[in-house]
Structures are given as C-alpha cells and as structure tokens.
C-alpha cells in the first residue's frame, strides 16, 4: 500500500524467469567436450542445465569408460570416440591441450559446421594446437577458427570455475554480447 493507493505489480516479460516461468531454448544447442577431464565433467553438467545437448568425445576407450563410470549426472548424453558431424548449433571445447590427439580432433571438428571451436589453455603460452594443425595440412584461415583462450576472464582456477567461465563466454557469444558487467 502506498499513499496513492494499493501497490500494483507491473508485468514485465524480462522478469518471467525470476518468477519461475522458464522459456524453452530458442533453438537446439549442442555442447561437445573433447577429452575426458574434470573440466569436461563440469562443462557438460552445467551445459546440460543450460539447455545444451551434452556430448563427450574421448578417443581413449579406458578414459571414456572411467568418465562414464558410476552415477552419471547426464541425461541423454552421448559418449563418443570421435568428433561427430556437427551443425551450426554446436559449440566444441577441447578440455586438454596436452593430449597428442588434439590436432586430429580439432582437424575433424574444423571439417564440420560447428558454430564455435575452442581449446582450453593459458593465454600467456602459445597454443600447441596451431603447430599440430599446420602439420596436418590445415590452412591458416581454418586454424584461426579455433578460439584460445576460451571463456570470460574471471580468474578461474578450479574445474568448476573454468567451466562457468567457458559457458559464460559461449553464452555471451551466442547472444552477441561482450560479456562482463556492461549492459
């Protein structure tokens, strides 16, 4: 109640989510994590919560089995040996830049129509994927499609923090926003 009369609530569609009305995703989204790792686990788990269809690509059968072992938090996830055919709804993140299969996995990803391809790694060091891809005969314009670093610069140190920063960066890019605190 105010001095002028009863307080009224003004309906604003931008507040719908805060009040429990969750709209369906605007379009199908796929998130591919290449290589089983702690970051991949959080990336796919949080990504699924954000409406992405989760896919893990792990060429090593033992690592793939270990990742899938036990209680899986993933619904309808795919666990594959190689990068599948991807369309423009897919974002792919290589979660281990030390793996010898990195170049081959990225080359295969670059042959798809994936919307976004990135490799985790410290931005102060050159990405090993560049030389790997060149040795495989991948042209420089294609190599340049691979983003590194990935995610927003929030000082991430732990696997969950890295996953959050990565997903925030992907969402900002998908929504044509710079990320950060400016609205």
Annotate each PLM feature.
Residues 1-72, 91, 125, 169-183:
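Segments forming oxygen-rich coordination pockets for charged ligands
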Residues 44, 105-106:
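Generic hydrophobic/aromatic pocket-lining and core-packing "Φ" positions
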Residues 71-76, 135-138:
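Short, hinge-like loop/turn segments at secondary-structure boundaries
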Residues 94-96:
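Short, well-ordered coil/turn residues at beta-beta hairpins
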Residues 99-103:
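Cytosolic regulatory regions of ion transport systems
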